[in-house]
Structures are given as C-alpha cells and as structure tokens.
Amino acid sequence: MSLRSKMKTTRRSIAIVGAGDASAAVCDLAYAAGRAVANRGAVLICGGRGGVMAAAARGTRSAGGMSVGILPGYNRDEANPHIEIAIATGMGEARNAIVVASADAVVALEGEGGTLSEIGLAIKLGRPVVGLRAWQQLEMISHADDPVAAVDLAWELARPRMIRSIAGDQGRAANDPGPMSRAPALAGRKKSAT
C-alpha cells in the first residue's frame, strides 16, 4: 500500500475531555468544539457519557461527524445518545488511558480529577493538549479561548504525529532514522550478565 493510499484511509482523531457534570456554558463550548472536530474531518474520541462528553458528541453528530465513546462500564447502553461507536471497557476511570491513547490530540475543558488524569496521560504519551478556557495554570499545554481555534490548534499540533504514523515510524522523531541505523554502534556493546 502506498503512502498516498494510507493517507486517504487514516483520519485524525481528537479527544474532547472535561467534566461529566458541566455547566451549560461549558457544554456550549464542548458542542462547538465537537462541531469543529467534525468540520475538520476528524473522529471525536470521548468518555461517552454526560456533560462535556455528551455535548461534544452532539456537536460532532450535528455536523455529520463520527464519535467514539470509551465507556467506563461493561454496558454499551451507558453511552449518551449521540455516540456513534460505543466501546464498553469495564475499566472504570482507567478507561481515561484509552481515551487519550486513541487520540492524536486532546482538547481539555474544565473538569476535575478525571480530566486532569487525562491531561497528564496525554502529556506522558506525547499527545498535544489544548486547554479550552481551562487549565491555564498548566504550562505544559497549549491554550485557546475559542472552540474552533482550540480544535484548529489541536489539528495542527497532531499533524507531525500523523505524518510519522502514516510513514510507519511509530512515533519516532522526524529526524530519527530508526533502530537499524544505530545497529552498528549497538553491535559492539557487551550484554550485561543479569
């Protein structure tokens, strides 16, 4: 399969994370961000339940996009009605790792410990994070005040990761030629006896 044909079948995914019990104002932001994800042609990844997750999925659906809900329980019926693909994990809050690992970038709205864990996991996994009118105290993430600007920034920040993924580099830096180029240097090393 050529690189060009892979590019046609590989879609970026953007996670939108935030409070499961959010204010109407925050849900309005999530809805607009969800629409922006669909308008970019990306797949929405979220926790699949209420609050920010439901508003983002509703926005994505209203713009004709696809949403995937990574659920904490074993029952797919727990998903909000706007989720197109519900994945029941039975993992509880540990499903947050799947949410961010499945995304190329994360847009984070206000939330509590669960949202903060998703931000931390995203940073650990090298996923770009954009705080949407939230998390300004975190200097390790980018920030935006507008939902469309947040998704646009997430889209652009995810681009280098997608290029590496499509090329088959599996997350290596663009200037890293891979393990085979280092093989001669490694061949001379002795293995430690452990």
Language-model features: locations:
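Short, ordered loop/turn segments at secondary-structure junctions
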Residues: 49-50, 72-75, 134-135
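A charged, well-structured terminal subsegment
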Residues: 101-106, 147-171, 176, 190-194
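Glycine-rich beta-alpha loop segments
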Residues: 2-68
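C-terminal binding/interaction regions
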Residues: 93-157
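Short, well-ordered alpha-helix to beta-strand connector turns
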Residues: 41, 83-84, 103, 126
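Solvent-exposed alpha-helices and their adjacent loops that cap or buttress functional pockets
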Residues: 6-10, 36-38, 77-80, 98-101, ...
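Helix-adjacent hinge/juxtasegments
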Residues: 58-102
